[in-house]
Amino acid sequence: MYISKQPFRKSKQPFRKSKQTFHKSKQPFRKFKQPFRKSKQPFRRRSRIGPGDRIDYRNMSLINRFISEQGKILSRRINRLTLKQQRLITVAIKQARILSFLPFRNYENEKQFQAQAISIITGPRHRKNRHIPQLTQKFNSNRNLRNSNQNLRNNNRNLSSDC
């Protein structure tokens, strides 16, 4: 059977993409033996502000809960407050600072905190006594002795190698 070769004909219609969309398989990629179950009850932490507490610059017992040891305002993440509550607390703290109910910074705790942080990072520091003349004289005399001993050793080697 002979099949004749026909020349390649260009179609008059432009190339069309198929209208079929890509279908994802019905089965999930990985099957787990026990599916993940959400708890029935929503997990909600209680706010540190009670229903009767007024957020005011005079309410120092409430304000002190939201200030760190260094005297900084704690973040919302740590406080677990709503945005509105956090704003009110921040305003109250700033008012209390301006009216000198609160210090702007707690310097005593801050110094302790900085000293601890530095010692943890760098380790203990030892001071070098460089400017005491007696020590520098001792150091120089020791250096001179070392140099003279080394020169003697070198001379002895040279003499022994010449023989």
Swiss-Prot record:
Bias (Basic residues) ranges: 7-48
Subcellular location: Plastid, Chloroplast
Pfam families the UniProt entry points to: Ribosomal_S18
Highest taxon in the source lineage: Eukaryota
InterPro entries hit by this protein: Ribosomal_bS18, Ribosomal_bS18_CS, Ribosomal_bS18_sf
Record's keyword terms, sorted: Chloroplast, Plastid, Ribonucleoprotein, Ribosomal protein, RNA-binding, rRNA-binding
GO BP, one annotated term: translation
Family membership noted in the UniProt record: Belongs to the bacterial ribosomal protein bS18 family.
NCBIfam families: S18
Protein name, entry field: Small ribosomal subunit protein bS18c
Species the sequence originates in: Sorghum bicolor
